[in-house]
């Protein structure tokens, strides 16, 4: 009878070693997977506008705290050092944006008030849907030292629109991004 137990023990020992090796392999795969940087949803895109001027932009759709979706387009026109703008677009018919209305931005104890430049853009100024607004992004980007989350507030339109750190990181890369 003892021989039967020894054979079972040997077989179980080999089975246990196989299971442990499998668990170790799964653990290593999991660690490698978690250690790799994830891809962000937003990306910098490069193209030329209708006048042939180089444009570098970050495009992201985000929801405010009332679950309304907004498209945020941060872009730079021309070579590095060119104008930096943030366009916020709502769905036509659902929202009407009055101009000029400053965009209020906060992060921790810091806050900014971005100037409304919508009426300076002939395309947006002539758009009867009034579903878009454009703001000067340069003062915000000049002050940001980290990729911290931001909270946007547009009085009379939305009370809070959270902007995640990966989007802030892309916005911060706009001033120096190659054409």
Where are these regions (language model features)?
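Bacterial N-terminal signal peptides
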Residues: 12-35
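Low-complexity, acidic Ser/Thr/Pro/Gly-rich terminal tails and inter-domain linkers that flank the onset
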Residues: 45-79
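A short, compositionally biased
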Residues: 52-58, 97-101, 143-149
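Short, surface-exposed binding/anchoring microloops in extracellular/periplasmic proteins
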Residues: 68-104
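Short, solvent-exposed, Trp/other aromatic-anchored flexible loops in extracytoplasmic proteins
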Residues: 109-158
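Boundary at the C-terminal end of the N-terminal hydrophobic targeting segment
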Residues: 40-44
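Short beta-strand elements
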Residues: 162-179
């Amino acid at each position: 009878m003892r021989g039967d137990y020894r054979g079972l023990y040997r077989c179980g020992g080999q089975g246990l070693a196989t299971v442990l090796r499998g668990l170790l392999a799964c653990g290593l795969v999991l660690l490698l997977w978690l250690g790799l940087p994830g891809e962000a949803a937003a990306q910098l895109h490069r193209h030329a506008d209708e006048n042939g001027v180089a444009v570098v932009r970050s495009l992201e759709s985000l929801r405010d705290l009332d679950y309304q979706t907004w498209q945020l387009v941060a872009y730079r026109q021309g070579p590095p050092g060119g104008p930096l703008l943030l366009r916020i677009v709502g769905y036509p018919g659902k929202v009407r944006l009055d101009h000029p209305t400053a965009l209020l931005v906060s992060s921790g104890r810091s806050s900014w008030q971005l100037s409304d430049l919508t009426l300076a853009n002939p395309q947006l100024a002539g758009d009867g849907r009034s579903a878009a607004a454009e703001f000067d992004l340069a003062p915000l980007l000049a002050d940001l030292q980290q990729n911290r989350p931001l909270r946007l507030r547009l009085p009379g339109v939305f009370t809070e629109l959270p902007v995640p750190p990966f989007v802030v990181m892309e916005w911060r890369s706009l001033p120096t991004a190659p054409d």
